[in-house]
Curated annotation (Swiss-Prot):
Domain CUE, chain residue ranges per copy: 77-120
CDD domains noted in UniProt: CUE_DEF1_like
Record's compositionally biased regions (Basic residues): 43-52, 129-138
Family annotation (InterPro entries): CUE (IPR003892), DEF1_CUE (IPR041803), TC-DDR_regulator (IPR051833)
Record function comment: Recruits the ubiquitination machinery to RNA polymerase II for polyubiquitination, removal and degradation, when the transcription-coupled repair (TCR) factor rhp26 fails to efficiently displace stalled RNA polymerase II. Also involved in telomere length regulation. Binds DNA.
Gene Ontology MF terms: DNA binding; ubiquitin binding
Amino acid composition bias (Low complexity), ranges on this chain: 245-272, 306-316
Subunit organization: Homodimer; may form higher order oligomers. Interacts with the large RNA polymerase II subunit RPO21; the interaction is direct and serves to bridge RPO21 to the Elongin complex in a manner dependent on transcription stress. Interacts with rhp26.
Gene source species: Schizosaccharomyces pombe (strain 972 / ATCC 24843)
Name the record gives this protein: RNA polymerase II degradation factor 1
Gene encoding the protein: def1
Family: Belongs to the DEF1 family.
Amino acid sequence: MSENKKFRPKKVGNTEQVSEKQHTDTALNISQDNKTSSSSAKRGAKGRRGTKGKSGPANSSQTSNIEGSNALELEFDRDSQLSVLQELFPSWTIDDLSFALEEADRDLELTILHITEGHASKWGEVKKKPIPKTKSKPTSHAPVSDNVSSTFRNATRKSKKPSASKDTSRGVRKSKAGAPSDPSSVHAPSSLEKPAGTGDLPSSEISTKAPASTTVSSSVDPGTINEDSSMKDHTTSNEQASVLTSANTAASTNTNGTAGGTSASAKSTSAADQAVASSKPIKKAWASVAKSKKKVTPAPAPAPESEPSKPSIAPSQPSKTNVSAAYEKPAELSSSSVPFPHKSQDSATPANVETTPSTATSAPKKSTAPFAINAVKPAPGLSNISSASLPKPSFAKQAAVGSQSSTTSMTTARLLSDRFPVVMPVANTAAIPEKVQVRFGSLTLGGEDKKSTKSSSDNIAQSGPRSSYFPKKTVSPKPEAKKEASKVAESTKIPKKQHTSAYESRAPQSKVPENLKESHVNETPYRGLHDVNLPASGNASSVSAIPPQVSAQTTIPAASTSATSGPVVGKQSAGYGGIYSPATHGISPQPYAGASLIPPSTGAAFNNETASSNAGETTALPYSSRFMNPVENRSANSPFDNFQHIDHSTELGYASNTSQQYQQTSHPAYTTMSPIEYGQAAPAAHYYNERNQYSQYDNVAGSASNTPDVHSVMHNKVASSNATSLPAAGTATPSPVVSQQQPQPYAFPPMYPIPYVSYGYGTMPYNNNKFGQPQQGYMSQSGFNDFPPIFGGHSNVYNRQQPGNVSGMSGTQTSNPINNATANTSGMTEKAAGHRDSVIGNGGVTGANSMSSTLGGLSSMSGMGRAAPGMFMGNVGSFENLSANAASPYGLPPQQTPLTNAATQQTTSFQSNANKVNNANSQPAGFPFNSGASTNAGSNGLGGYNAYNQSFINRPGGWYGNA
């Protein structure tokens, strides 16, 4: 067996401790007897396998051959056993399992039982076995230390947090059979017990560091003593001392030789022990153990660090041991020697705990009792272990680390609270609660993040162990935590989303009149009549400068004189594509711009520069539109019946003009128009009986009467003769009346209706026209829409050209038939050569004079009568390029005739619209689309104005139908 023993240690005991234990004497000395005694002592608690140990002598008498064969078998058996153990306990290393197997005399079942019950410890763990049942609870120093150490070890094992050095733990295990006779093994617990039970040790000692040697000796020595002394009849005290020293060395991470290392580990251990003790001062076992244990002078404690913490903690006089002195010094280090700015970090700062992970818990300050740590409770099954015993397992690893981490790792940030000067290092062992809810100085037990959000009171309150003996990791928040939280709350506040379209950012936020507000009205008013940018020149008369005045009138204003305040432009209630557009159901207008969906050329037209009088500059042209997602048609709350009046000289385009004409919106002919949802089939006749009525009046000398010349444009008409409500004959209106373009009901998707936009005398592109009469354009959707263009033409353009020549008129206009308008095919007749109106009807317009646009039948002009309008659809161009198919600056192809290439000619070449008094009876009411009744309306020739339509193309999206 001696050979077998020799063979065994080589395999099993790679560590010094095992070899020391088994080979301290000759192989013969460490024969089966020793193993038997140790195994029996080890198993004393369990009472198993005693027979094998007893039969050791008989086995030793067997032949060496048998022993050799047994050794080989044991070796193979050990390998298989280790493999089984490793599968069962993957967290255990081979060395730990080998050692545990050795302790169980290579009994696999017993080894498993030891490990599962916590009686076997890993190399890094101090605790190894539960309290031997044979031994009484610590009435004497040795038994108490045994119980405490073993129970603590068990707790540690259960927590499965390995202590620092495995070597130490193994060495300790070998030596841990009996009650610790070695004072060094006892002294650490005693010092711990003293702080907890009696508070004899200075709190500084407790709080700072337990010398690594002390920690090891306390945790290991009990085990060592248990094995060696109880099982082995105590090896010589020197042997035990050496074992303890080696254990301490391992525990302190090979710092056993150095007093500093020992003191550091002792500090951490003592701090942990004392912290535990302080956490559970109530346990007398701790106190009794401390008292009973012999004073042992562990490795010389490191130079005492500043002891300010000492005074804060009612220093219980270090009881009789050098260990207490070692503890004192570590305590001094942790509490005061380490200069930590006492910031208002709560004393129970997890960071503090982390910094002193080597120590189990922080020692209580002066008022240790108030901070009694309820949290540190022995794991169930450790009932006999006093809270002081738990701190013991600040193991060699922790002790070694603690010696440095408690000093070096503890940074000034860790000690933030000057209210608690004493800081206890925290033990890393799982058995010890990571955080005891007691503050010592700015440090709390249980290493955690520096940033703690809980109050110190919470830390203290949370004394109960978490999940058996782990207290909740709570740290009192720094004083500024609340502020930070509030800041976070503020930052998390989500500001209400604001609509910031390019248009709105520029639009003056003028209020929408109450009469225009609908339940669906967008509360964000939109800028100005024309939806144009502010002129770069800052023209005060720009649209944005003075928002239009909105009138609630629902009838055409009464006749007035030329002294009226200025042009009045009627828009649909807040005007689609212009002015406010409040009734867009949340769809905000988006003006054309370079970044929009329309071509840059059209976007350029949006940039209005009134200061730029060059007719060739397309950027000087007002433009307004919005591309929006289609919205289903709405008929409710139609805004069509409202007038908007814009005072003279306050809006773009209305420079002083001779007659100060009014312009307003009236659409009585919409009575038969109803909205349909896109995709719906075209309705029956009369459904499209919509008409834009243009009534203009100019009180010019020589006029036969102050009656308006009423014209109406109908587009997309299904045969109907029921249009009604044109202004009564002889009713003079102070200005042209411009109706909104109605959306094409069968267009998919329905188009936004675009209002006529009129610009007066002296403004772009109406250069010095005689009276500055605004022109009205009626635009169709084009290929510039973000929906598939409908080139068939779904809208009409009506332009009135009146150079103001009041000469007699003669001649007759040829018939102007329009498809689907079968009831009114007689066309228009005029007796004055220059009296012309132009209707660009549906793509179905027929006639000798009809002309298709460049977009392929989008709209055609029929008849040359009443002055040729400027109809532009399609590509962009310039004023100078106005040939038949030239592109216009508005993105619209020009009407082919009678336009010329010279912009100047366009303002002068158009026939004048002479006074209609002479032919009032024979002149249908503006257009043949009316009921056919003659309009006794006469009008002086109005000032000529350019034949360019202000280009507003229909936009896809919702529209609101007719009132």
